[in-house]
Design a protein with these regions (language model features):
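Conserved Hanks-type protein kinase catalytic core
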Residues: 69
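Portal/gating segments that form or line small-molecule/metal binding sites
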Residues: 66
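Compact, Lys/Arg-rich rRNA/RNP-binding cores from ribosome-related proteins
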Residues: 82
Length: 104
């Protein structure tokens, strides 16, 4: 499966620690190989859309998320990457991911 990382998402990923980026690249490789990911690495996000999920990473410094969208079962788009301090995903991050998905 093809994986596309939006330019805005690439910029956001550059703020992640190196260890988290390595974990992210491992997860992307699995998705490319067609491996279905589940908790705790990936969680569906029906509040944004039926084919939307997030990659979940954590280290001592914080919590990191990358929201992605599966389009027509032949491409995956990484649309938004961010760190957060609380368990709940901030509404502004959900809204931004939703906006980027609508543009695809």
């Amino acid at each position: 499966m093809e994986v596309e990382i939006l330019e805005t998402c690439k910029k956001e990923l550059r703020t992640f620690p190196e260890e988290i980026l390595e974990d992210f690249l491992d997860a992307v490789a699995k998705l490319k190989d067609g491996i279905s990911l589940s908790m705790p690495l990936s969680r569906k996000m029906p509040s944004i859309g039926p084919l939307v999920a997030e990659l979940r990473f954590r280290d001592r410094a914080g919590i990191y998320r990358v929201i992605y969208f599966i389009k027509k079962r032949d491409a995956i788009y990484m649309v938004h990457a961010f760190s957060k301090k609380t368990q709940k995903t901030p509404k502004k991050n959900l809204d931004l991911a939703s906006k980027r998905i609508r543009r695809l």
